[in-house]
Amino acid sequence: MRLLFFIFILSLSLTSVAQQKMPVAGIDITGNSKTKDYIILRELPFVKGDSLEAKQLAPAIIQAKQLLMNTQLFVDVQIDTLANDGQWQIRIQVKERWYLLPLPYFRLVDRNFNQWWVDQNRSLDRVNYGMKFIQNNVSGRNDNLNVWLITGYNRQFSARYTIPFIDKKLTKGFSVGFLHATQKELNIATAGNKQVFLRHSSDARKTWRIDASYSYRPDRFKRTTIRLSYFNETIADTILIVQKNYYPGQTNRQAALDISYRYQYINVSNITYPTSGYYSDLFLLKRVASRAQSIFQISARQLYAKKLSTKSFLLLDATAAYKSPIDSVFSNSRLIGYGGMQLRGLEYYVVDGTAGIVSRNAFHFNVKNFTLTNPVPIKNHEKIPIRLYLKMFADAGYAYHKYAGRSNSLSNTLLYTYGAGIDLVSVYDFVFRVEYSRNQLGREGLYLQGEFNF
């Protein structure tokens, strides 16, 4: 009887503690040899002095870890809490990434691996190579300096410096960049729903560009970016003979000022491979040039990831785009198959248009998590975590083109694909995808995709 009475009193005490609001007395951070403390503190959904119940603190800790990992500064984040004398003590331990990365560069010039392997006969001539000099977190404020020296099929020199916060409130930032590039071959048309290329003996296109942007991030989830970019492009005269409508005004040169606005809302578990949360992106671009060359573009993306269980989640991802004028020239009418508007199962095809939408939907199931021991013992990288997901997907899309032509039958047609695959997810936002899919043309195949965030 005494034992039951003791358990009853103890349970009441624990319930009282759980419901009691206690102040955050301190936040201790370790492991950040380069990153400034205030950059880490800025991402937390709580500050020193906040009064929180235990039931409020638990989800806040989960969100804090997600926000810190989404800075892409760390390979791991651990957060512990201690209740002592009616106060919370928060302990954050981070493992920093490599920030100085002189890396060899090797990349196919084609849109994806399968197009290079099949349509381009695995030609090693269609490869860009060189060096990427990447200094992330230059001053410990998550600022980045990138210098690319690329040669091979195309040549490119580019440099960019980005700093997210330049003010005391840690809300305003800027970026500046420069690019000079030349191409030996140019995609001049679409025929049979595939890209048509024309190679030039010297340079098919020359480009140089300078840009500057201002960013504003008032809280942990909202981001606004305004960018000014001036560019000058010239294509070879022989290109103009074959494709006179490559640029507006049937000219071989285009010089203009691009003014763009982007709004993002990012509240996902992982910015590279979200398993829960929301992501919204609105992008507007106005090209200021002569009347013949002025264009306007708008695109919007909405992603929703819903956790169904501890091992499964549903991912819904839709993107819509519109380009004006509606009868744009070829260089402004590439749509599905380019950039973020991709349909799994149509890797060999492109769909031109000036307005369109893509919907990508998938069910994912986590089948295995394991850790590999790094054969080369390196600080903060002794272990390599691996996650494997099985997935089933169904995609759909539509692209409107005023002058599609009979050979490009996928324009002005409802598109759909479906299939299954497996994703491998690891450190440095590495994602490798193996997918078997079938499209509405009745064609099916195995497709490989890889992403590495360096």
Predicted feature locations:
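Short glycine-rich beta-strand segments
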Residues: L179-Q183, F231-E233, F283-A289, A321-P325, ...
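Gram-negative/organellar outer-membrane beta-barrel architecture
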Residues: R97-S260, Y265-V268, Y278, L335-M341, ...
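Coil residues (strongly favoring Ser/Thr
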Residues: S51, T81, D237-T238, S328
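A short beta-strand motif that forms the metal-chelation/ATP-contact edge
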Residues: Q89-V94, L390, L446-G450
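Periplasmic polypeptide-binding modules associated with outer-membrane biogenesis and secretion
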Residues: Q19-N112, K132, N146-F165, I298-R301, ...
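Outer-membrane beta-barrel transmembrane domain signature
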Residues: A362-L372, V376, H381-G419
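C-terminal outer-membrane beta-barrel translocator/porin domains of Gram-negative envelope proteins
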Residues: A256-K383
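Bacterial Sec-dependent N-terminal signal peptides
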Residues: M1-P23, F454
